[in-house]
Amino acid sequence: MVLCYDVFITVEEKMAMAGGHYDQSLYDEFVKVLDRLDTMKKETDQKIAGLNNEISDLKKENKKLQKENDLLKEDNTRLKNLLNHDSSNTSKPPSSDQKPGRAANNYNNRKKSEKKPGAQTGHKGTTLSKEKVEEKLASGKYLHEIETIGKVSERGYVVRYVIDLRVQPVIREIRIYKDADGKYPIPERYRSEVVYGPTVRALAVDLYSEGVMSNDRIAAFLNDASEGCLELSEGSVYGFCRKFSDLSGTEIEKLEEHLTNQPVVATDATTVSLNGKQSYIRNISDEKMVVYYGMEKKTKEALGEIPFFSSYAGTLLHDHETALYQYGTDHAECNVHILRYLKKNTEETGNQWSKELSDLLCEINRERKKQKEEGKSCFSEEKRQEYEKRYAACLEKGIEENHSTKHKYAKREEKTLLTRLEKYRENHLLFLKRFEVPFDNNMSERDLRKVKNRQKMAGGFRKEKGQKMYCRILSIVETLKRRKMNLMAHIKQIFIGTPAIF
């Protein structure tokens, strides 16, 4: 509001205007009106100044609220994205995929097919046939018993086989006679007057390696299976496992030596508790064997304490552990993890470069499998360069799309992903140049699955020697399984002292 006065006059001018022609009272009234107008102008100016200040304050407050609103929107978007994070688009374990209406372990990167559940047409079945059972009987490894139904006659019969297991405790009496010197040559394993045989000990070690039962439950299970005849205790089971671990030292060294000479080995680590603190168990494996180690940390120094890493000169396949880049001569990255991150980026930003790169990596892997089936060891130079150019084009498109990504957190994470894909391009595409390098590190994931199960089911470790014992036992058992060797027979051989199995 602005008040305008066309004429401002002084007292002398007022007198001149009066010129004696106006009454004094009229003049006084006119002066009062002018005074009131002056007062109104001052009051109006003050109100205008106050309103201007108020408007200025409101603008500042509006800007502040706008910033807060933008931050809340960013936080809301980030939290929504976090709710959608699971094992299919991050490195979170499947066991954490708990969402309303859906069970855990129900998420992966596989796409649904139209196939029905169960056996597929053209696949070989695994039904145990009558002919296979008769072959087993002929081998002499099975006790053959005959049971009849109906009256025995010459009219003929049909045969049905029932395969069962009979658990019968055996007490073997060992008689040790004096030698020529009049002494009893008692072997070390028979120092105690009563000992458990290799079969009982092998069963206990095998159950312990599974990691789903505590020692007292293993003892209870074997006691129940023997109808109470064994009378095992928790301490007995621990003693069997400790003895097996001690006897496995030579075999572990052979496994380590074999892995050191391999061109490509896979490794990963998972968290376990040790005396209430966070610790790790790491695997080192190839297609034929695996060795486990306990670690306090995942640092470069902790890795250096494992003799394998300081002597290995091949290619390490891992899940982007930067500390591992200090060891070995070459490195391959797990691309399944990258596929998850690319899926997450597509969901959160809506940008297409990550979807295109994901499709490209899967295409390369499919074509690689076909080439391997045809006996080839690598792509042609022309094909390899084509794939590398397409990879680079996806990253260039990603950089352009990142400029227009709206949400701050998604934009920052996308930029980080693009930087990683560019910096470690050779490591992510090593499987493209060398077919002996796997596309993913799923082998290590499977190797550590038992360790994770043990942590959840039986708990962690109270002492470091307990962790070391478990790692040694698991190394032997999992290697035997991977080589499809008779598990119980070879565990018993180690107990007996003839462990030449590797």
Residues covered by each model-derived region:
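Catalytic center-proximal scaffold of phosphoryl-transfer enzymes
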Residues: V2-D23, Y27, V31, K42, ...
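Short, flexible loop/hinge motifs at secondary-structure junctions
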Residues: M1-S192, Y238, T267
